[in-house]
Amino acid sequence: MELHRADQDGDQDQMEEGKRIRRLQVMMSMVMSVISQDPNLTVEEAAEMAANARRAALSLFPDKELAYDLIYRPRLQRLMNERFRLQ
């Protein structure tokens, strides 16, 4: 009985993590879409959006700063370099 309850708790944890992962993916997709498509967006606004997205991601996954820096930071940097012709 105790093992069954622990298994249910593990399933619940996995479901919650899956929801947070999906929320992060949707949020980052939206941020990257706005940065790439909004013609009125300034480089400062884009940088602020990227910083806010990082803070939000780390609030969802506090212990995953390295993962964020490896996965999303290069994508955002590349996007901003292409969009604003930064070097």
Which ranges hold each PLM region?
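N-terminal acidic leader/helix
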Residues: A6-V43
